[in-house]
Amino acid sequence: MFLYTENFDEQKEKAMEGLRKALEEDKVDHDIIPLLEKINALQNYFTTSSCSGRISVMEMPHFGDKVNSVWLGKWHREVRLEEVLEAVGKHRSGQLWFLVRSPILHVGARTLEDAVRLLNLAIGLGFKYSNIKSVSHKKLVVEIRSTERMDVPLGENGELWVDEAYIEKIVNLANAQVRRFKGKLKRLEEEIEKLQED
């Protein structure tokens, strides 16, 4: 027997303790909570981390430097042009980026067979970048990810390279992506109980 299978119940208990704490501290995206509850109610799965997807405006010293980056605006929903313009107006230094990130969930599975069942369900529902993230002695983790993503440079060192009309266009595109991935999350929430053992 694989150690991750032997350790499953202990790892799930630890993860549920972490989730309870995160919920108490309001650190969980509200619209993904029903899905997390359904996954965690399944005997052979548990969630370790999640994000319901987001639109953001970020200031980076240089591209890829996440450690020293600053959020100027972050939304786990559709966004209004005015909100984005307000965030853009805070830009002072470094590079200014408009970003969209699809939902991501990390789910522990009891066995490799369980992991593959979840992976096949997720991919079938449009989470095309889903994969088995890690297999270690402690746990077996499936990463559920979709394809929606935008990385749009807007300016640098306080200078804006684009006008408001352009920002309005990318906000509309971003909101369309949000609607798409929120729909996928809803379908996953509706279908996840198929993984319940009889």
From Swiss-Prot:
Q: Which InterPro entries match?
A: Taw3 (IPR022908), tRNA_yW-synthesising (IPR003827), tRNA_yW-synthesising-like_sf (IPR036602)
Pfam families from the xrefs?
Answer: TYW3 (PF02676)
Coiled-coil residues are none
Could you tell me the EC number(s) of this protein?
Answer: 2.1.1.282
Listed A to Z, the keywords are:
Methyltransferase, S-adenosyl-L-methionine, Transferase, tRNA processing
Q: Name one GO molecular function term.
A: tRNA methyltransferase activity
Q: Has keyword Protein biosynthesis?
A: no
Q: Which reaction does it catalyse?
A: 4-demethyl-7-[(3S)-3-amino-3-carboxypropyl]wyosine(37) in tRNA(Phe) + S-adenosyl-L-methionine = 7-[(3S)-3-amino-3-carboxypropyl]wyosine(37) in tRNA(Phe) + S-adenosyl-L-homocysteine + H(+)
Q: Which GO terms describe its biological process?
A: tRNA methylation; wybutosine biosynthetic process
Described function: S-adenosyl-L-methionine-dependent methyltransferase that acts as a component of the wyosine derivatives biosynthesis pathway.
HAMAP family found in the cross-reference section: TYW3_archaea
State the family it belongs to: Belongs to the TYW3 family.
Question: What name does UniProt use for this protein?
Answer: tRNA(Phe) 7-((3-amino-3-carboxypropyl)-4-demethylwyosine(37)-N(4))-methyltransferase 1
What is the phylogenetic placement of the source species in the record? Archaea, Methanobacteriati, Methanobacteriota, Thermococci, Thermococcales
